[in-house]
A protein has these predicted regions:
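Conserved nucleotide-binding/hydrolysis modules and their immediate coupling elements
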Residues: 99-172
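Conserved helicase motor core of P-loop NTPases
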Residues: 1-125, 131-133
């Protein structure tokens, strides 16, 4: 449909929310163009891990987040570091990596479970859909500040602004 020109379409080719001089943006363009990634040694905003098998990749990702990056750059792994993967399912997808990273970085505390996902006080979360009523949008990142297991609700802090999520909203 898009190629036919019958329906109006817009191609988004500008990357927002990121320093345009970094390797993250450069490599995002390479991925979109089907080109090889640019990888540099030393201090950079982009690290690529090549692993022998998926299980090793998970272990290395956890090690990078919990030890290597905080030690080398003095960063808080919960607040300052982002793991990007291209899929949700399987051992290397966001679903599993989020569980493993939560075990390593935020293993204790009050929690609620929705649809198999555990939300724990202190977790970093990302809004997946625009919610105009709450004034939060796809890609916004916040931290779980409080949970109420009786009401199946939680409060997420987005840049100092608390937003309440009820049971049905937790899928957002």
């Amino acid at each position: 449909l898009i190629k036919s020109g019958v329906v109006p379409a817009t191609k988004l080719d500008f990357i927002f929310r990121q320093d345009t001089s970094g390797l993250i943006v450069t490599n995002a363009h390479h991925v979109n163009a089907g080109e090889p990634l640019e990888v540099r040694q030393g201090e950079t905003d982009f690290y690529f891990m090549r692993c022998e098998d998926p299980e090793t990749c998970v272990k290395r990702a956890i090690e990078f987040m919990t030890t290597r990056i905080p030690r080398k750059f003095g960063m808080d792994p919960l607040a300052d570091v982002q793991v990007l993967v291209p899929m949700r399912k399987n051992i290397l997808g966001t679903d599993n990596l989020n569980v493993e990273l939560q075990k390593a970085l935020n293993p204790r505390g009050d929690a609620i479970i929705r649809g198999g996902t555990m939300f724990r006080v202190g977790d970093r979360v990302m809004q997946l859909r625009n919610n105009y009523d709450k004034d939060v949008y796809n890609g916004d990142v916040g931290f779980v500040k409080a949970v109420n297991s009786d009401d199946r609700a939680m409060i997420v802090n987005f840049d100092g602004r608390p937003v309440k999520y009820d049971g049905g909203d937790l899928d957002e």
